[in-house]
Every structure is written in C-alpha cells, then in structure tokens.
C-alpha cells in the first residue's frame, strides 16, 4: 500500500525521533504531526512549547543529539545572568539560542497570532519536512497534584516543575489538564484525521502526551472516525520506560507499566478505544482484546533502527481497520473507557 497522508500523535523526544524515522521511511508521503502542548509554560515572560520545539529542532537538524532536547551548540550566558539577578525560576534551563525561538513565539502570540500560525512561521525556518500542528490554539497546561512536603496537603504544581525541578519525585496523585475543557482542535487537526491513510501513536507518554492530546474535545471522536488504521507503538520495553516518566504517570491511572497495560489502556477502536494494531518490543507479550499485536524491535538506537520501526508500524497499518469502528454517537460502557 502506498501511503499518501499519515498523521502522528507525538510528544517530545520519543515522538520527534519516531517522526524522523518515518520521514526517512516514506519520504514522499505527506506527514502531519499533532503535537502535545500540555507541557507548555510561561517563564520569564516567554511562552515555551517544549514538545513542539523538540520536534521542530529534531526534524530541522538543530537538536542537541546528546540530550535529545534544546539546541545543538548551545550557550548559557542569559541563564547565568538571570541567576546572578536572582530571577526565578533558575531550575528551568533556557539556552541563548533557544531563547530566540521563545522571543519570536511570544512576540507573535502577543500580537494576536494563534499558536498554529506561530508554529508554522517558526517551522518555515527549520523546514522539518513534516506539517507541525499544535493540538489546540488555546492555552492548556498539565498540572500535577502532589502532597505538600511541609503540610501533607494536596497542591497542584505545573508539570514542568514536577518533572524538571523535582524529577518526578513527589508521588503524583492526579494529572489535571487546566483549560482543556474550553479548548478546540487547532485548525487542520480534525481535517488531518478525516483524510489520513493511517494514524500512528508515537511511543510518547500515554498520560501526559497522547492522553492530553486526546483530551481536547472532539479529537477522540475524530480518531474513532478516521478512515485509516490506527497503530500505536509501546513506550514500554521489557517492563520499563526507555526515556521519560511514564512509569511515574501510568500507576496514577491504575495502568500497569507494561506493553500490555498500555495497550489495554488505549483499548480497541472497535470497542470505543483507540487502536487497531499495537506494536510491542521483540520478546514482550501483550494480550489486547480486538487489537492486532505485533512484536518488533522498538529501540530507536540509530537512524536505521528508527526507520525500520517506522516501516514496521506502516506494515501494521495496511489493510484497514481490524474491526469497523462504532457508529457515530455510540460508546462503550463507561467502566471500560480508557481513562486518559
């Protein structure tokens, strides 16, 4: 099968690397990335979109290859000067090159441009070869409910503070996507789902990346109705995360940290879930009812391995949905609904 239009739901590092492999595997296909913006934050008066920037820098050749985020050849003069002034926060590193992106973004947002247009303008410099769409133009921020170490009372902190400052050490009790109820899909997102030959869930965090994207009203329904097959790639390999903090997030929703656990959490599209097919790592076993499961090498250890993973994902997308999606307006029993 020749794929004309492929849509990918992506978070940061894992999603960016998967997209790079996909671009290599199918250079002639139209690729659209719907990127999580729940990690976005305003610091020092600047609007920062970590996942969008990681995808843009990775595909544009400007990423720091060692860290997997931020700019290559970065310097930290402004960060040092801010620290010398005692300007908080000091725990979030903004490099000098990276600051230029945030300055341009913030200036355009302040001038009234929506995030989708701002992202397109920024991407025009980087030429990523992939259409980059934020999940929404509205402001949505993930907050984490934790216990105050001093009082034991519950408090909510921004996801970036929980992850970057505290390294996800305070046990998360809940994740709250502030603003998501009032959000709408960004222009082009629902249309991309409607025209897709395949929709791929990158090996991104199921809770705070993929789950946040599909929390935007209308996007889960758009995914259910897409004419192409929906294939997910497990972010869990041999019972552990490859990168990130999914192992700290999944238990909050009562999801087992395993390829099977995440697959069941996503569920079968034929039963109101997300998946037609699910890729797990070679040697991992997963029983996901009504979902075709394939075991292939998942580690994106080189450009060649990543492109091979992308091709395996597309192989699983051939043949149309495993079972027809439910009729419009139907839904399965609430007790069986995956809780993103």
Residue ranges and their predicted role:
Residues 18-29:
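A short, Lys/Arg-enriched amphipathic alpha-helix followed by its capping loop at the start of a domain
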Residues 27-29, 226-230, 275:
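A short helix->loop->beta-strand "cap" motif at the edges of active sites that frequently abuts
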Residues 173-193:
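Active-site glycine-rich loop that binds ribose-phosphate moieties when present
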Residues 196:
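An anion/phosphate-binding loop that grips the pyrophosphate of nucleotide cofactors and donors
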Residues 214-253:
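Redox- and metal-dependent alpha/beta enzyme cores, enriched for Fe-S-associated oxidoreductases
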Residues 243-327, 335-340:
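C-terminal functional extensions of proteins
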């Amino acid at each position: 099968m020749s794929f004309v239009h492929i849509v990918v739901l992506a978070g940061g590092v894992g999603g960016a690397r998967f997209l790079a492999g996909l671009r290599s595997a199918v250079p002639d296909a139209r690729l659209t990335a719907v990127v999580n913006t729940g990690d976005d934050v305003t610091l020092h008066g600047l609007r920062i979109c970590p996942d969008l920037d990681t995808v843009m820098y990775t595909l544009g050749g400007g990423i720091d290859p060692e860290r997997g985020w931020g700019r290559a050849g970065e310097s930290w003069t402004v960060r040092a000067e801010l620290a010398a002034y005692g300007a908080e926060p000091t725990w979030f590193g903004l490099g000098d090159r990276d600051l230029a992106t945030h300055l341009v973004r913030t200036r355009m947002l302040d001038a009234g441009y929506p995030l989708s247009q701002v992202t397109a303008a920024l991407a025009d410099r980087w030429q990523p070869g992939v259409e980059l769409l934020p999940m929404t133009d509205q402001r949505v921020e993930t907050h984490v409910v934790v216990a105050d170490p001093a009082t034991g009372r519950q408090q909510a902190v921004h996801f970036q503070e929980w992850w970057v400052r505290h390294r996800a050490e305070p046990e998360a009790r809940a994740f709250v996507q502030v603003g998501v109820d009032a959000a709408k899909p960004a222009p082009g997102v629902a249309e991309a789902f409607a025209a897709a030959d395949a929709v791929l869930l990158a090996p991104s965090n199921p809770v705070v990346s993929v789950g946040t994207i599909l929390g935007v009203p209308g996007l889960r329904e758009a995914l259910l109705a897409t004419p192409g097959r929906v294939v997910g790639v497990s972010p869990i390999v041999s019972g552990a995360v490859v990168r990130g903090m999914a192992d700290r997030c999944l238990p909050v929703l009562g999801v087992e940290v395993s390829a099977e656990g995440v697959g069941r959490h996503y569920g079968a599209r034929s039963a109101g879930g997300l998946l037609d097919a699910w890729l797990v790592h070679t040697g991992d076993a997963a029983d996901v009812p009504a979902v075709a499961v394939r075991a292939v090498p998942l580690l994106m250890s080189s450009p060649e391995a990543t492109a091979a993973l992308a091709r395996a994902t597309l192989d699983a997308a051939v043949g149309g949905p495993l079972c027809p999606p439910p009729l419009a307006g139907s839904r399965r029993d609430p007790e069986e609904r995956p809780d993103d």
